[in-house]
Amino acid sequence: MLGATAAAGALLPRAGFAAATASTADAAKLTKIGVQLYSVRGAMEKDGVESTLARIAQLGYREVEFAGYFGRTAAQIRDTLKANGLTSPSVHVPLQQLTAPDFPKFVDDAATIGHKWINLAWLAPPDRGTVAKYESHANALLAAQKVASAAGLTMGYHNHEFEFDPLGATDGYEILLERTRGSGVQFEMDMYWMSVAGKDPVSYWKRFPGQFPMIHVKDNAGAPSNEMRPVGGGSINWAALFEQRKVGGVKHFYVEHDNPPDPWASITQSMAYLKRLRFR
């Protein structure tokens, strides 16, 4: 455990904004904040990829994580990112993409765009619930990693809360971590879902150091509602968490809010909080 107070406090309620910040004298801050574009998928569909990415950049975001390309080619995505001073370190894909016949072409397109990671985004209910299913998913990630690594990319896995449902003496997340250990496969930890599951992120970072290059930064109002909130509007102690970022190897911080009433207001509020936040 991370020096008991910081580890336990990372996902516990804060005593207020001041308690979640370090003194300004020797404080660190996030210098390159990203956003998962699923948060603004409605705008991507209605207003277009180009105008949406331009607006994202105007808010101060410098990195984006894709969840679909909305009919644009890899070259079009690459050029739009460049025009707006953005980069896209990673992309989310469904399980079926990993075993699709055109996966090598997808990897080539991802490299054209500039992605470094291809992250398995989610498992549908029929794809969960047994040791055998998670072992199969680990094997799919391992096979995909061979294809991705040949093009200079890395496979990753993005968690929700269901991976932590007990499966005898283990759980799905443990199976994925252990089965892919040493393979090059990495993990994108979602802080909201870790909070819902009641899990301590840093305990995993310590057990698998350097294996979590990306995190989803989204807040949780806390039990009993577990309502998703803009960053800084919930119970997660972000300063305590970010202070341990190097343990997990975290370098990319993606704001996300799955279904906000106003997506733009949500990611604007999250950006404002993260720009103010200081930590050690």
PLM regions and their residue ranges:
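Conserved, mostly hydrophobic/aromatic
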Residues: 35, 56, 64, 81, ...
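N-terminal export signals
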Residues: 1-20
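C-terminal helical cap(s) of enzyme catalytic domains, especially alpha/beta-barrels
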Residues: 264-280
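Gly/Pro-rich active-site loop or hairpin
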Residues: 41, 52-53, 62, 164-170, ...
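Glycine-rich, proline-tolerant flexible connector loops at the mouths of alpha/beta enzymes
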Residues: 65-82
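Active-site acidic/histidine proton-transfer and metal-coordination neighborhood
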Residues: 63, 70, 87-89, 95-187, ...
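C-terminal segment of N-terminal export signals and the immediately downstream linker at the start
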Residues: 14-38, 42-46
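A general structural detector for well-ordered alpha-helical segments in enzyme core domains, enriched
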Residues: 51-55, 76-80, 102-109, 133, ...
